[in-house]
């Protein structure tokens, strides 16, 4: 038996993007929904500063997922959202970054719609754009790159096309942004090199992008794996590949004469 709200209607689920980490980057609409939510189900990468915006009277439930550590299975999360929508008018599913950029928002929306629940998507700033920006790496620049590809380094076994076509990406995009790719670089980089990218191709890893603890590791295809080991550089991190990675260093070099050699 399905229990409905007192007016006989189901509540509404809002898939809200929390942004990449800096609480100032959540949208006005997203913040307003958090302040008025009756229930919030949030992911692991949502910061405590964002969670502090939630209505103190709301149910607050952790559904976070990390590599190797799943608080709830995906099916359990969507079932939970459906149950919450039966008793609350405003339910927020709070996801890091943007719900529809490697955030499983599409899968959750599909399940909720099938259950007869109204869903609204509130986009967020994705880490693949924000982290490079905070690291002063422009993904496109007239002198460096006129194309960018966003790709996951962590494939789903059930996808209709089982493997990323790294050769096509290497040949078709001047900037490559990889989500969840730190632990897969040892297999990804050889495929990109087979497609024509050289060992001197610039690569940057940005950890905890937009947060105070943000870290950046810059190298080349030839050096980056050893650098990761030496620095013990851990996920989560965004990987940026292409000439744009060299932009900050080149800019400092150009400005040195103006600034008297000050970096």
From Swiss-Prot:
Keyword Nucleus in record: no
Entry's Gene Ontology BP terms: cobalamin biosynthetic process; methylation; siroheme biosynthetic process
GO molecular function terms noted in the UniProt entry: uroporphyrin-III C-methyltransferase activity
Catalytic activity annotation: uroporphyrinogen III + 2 S-adenosyl-L-methionine = precorrin-2 + 2 S-adenosyl-L-homocysteine + H(+)
Pathway the protein contributes to: Cofactor biosynthesis; adenosylcobalamin biosynthesis; precorrin-2 from uroporphyrinogen III: step 1/1; Porphyrin-containing compound metabolism; siroheme biosynthesis; precorrin-2 from uroporphyrinogen III: step 1/1
Enzyme class: transferase
Superkingdom to which the source organism belongs: Bacteria
Pfam families per UniProt: TP_methylase
Binding site for S-adenosyl-L-homocysteine: 20, 96-98, 126-127, 180, 237
EC number: 2.1.1.107
UniProt xrefs under PROSITE patterns: SUMT_1, SUMT_2
InterPro entries in UniProt: 4pyrrol_Mease, 4pyrrol_Methylase_sf, 4pyrrole_Mease_sub1, 4pyrrole_Mease_sub2, CobA/CysG_C, Siro_Cobalamin_biosynth, Uropor_MeTrfase_CS
Keywords, alphabetical: Cobalamin biosynthesis, Methyltransferase, Porphyrin biosynthesis, S-adenosyl-L-methionine, Transferase
Function: It is a step in the biosynthesis of both cobalamin (vitamin B12) and siroheme.
NCBIfam families: cobA_cysG_Cterm, PRK06136.1
Family: Belongs to the precorrin methyltransferase family.
Matching PANTHER family: S-ADENOSYL-L-METHIONINE-DEPENDENT UROPORPHYRINOGEN III METHYLTRANSFERASE, CHLOROPLASTIC, SIROHEME SYNTHASE-RELATED
Protein name as catalogued: Uroporphyrinogen-III C-methyltransferase
Species name: Synechocystis sp. (strain ATCC 27184 / PCC 6803 / Kazusa)
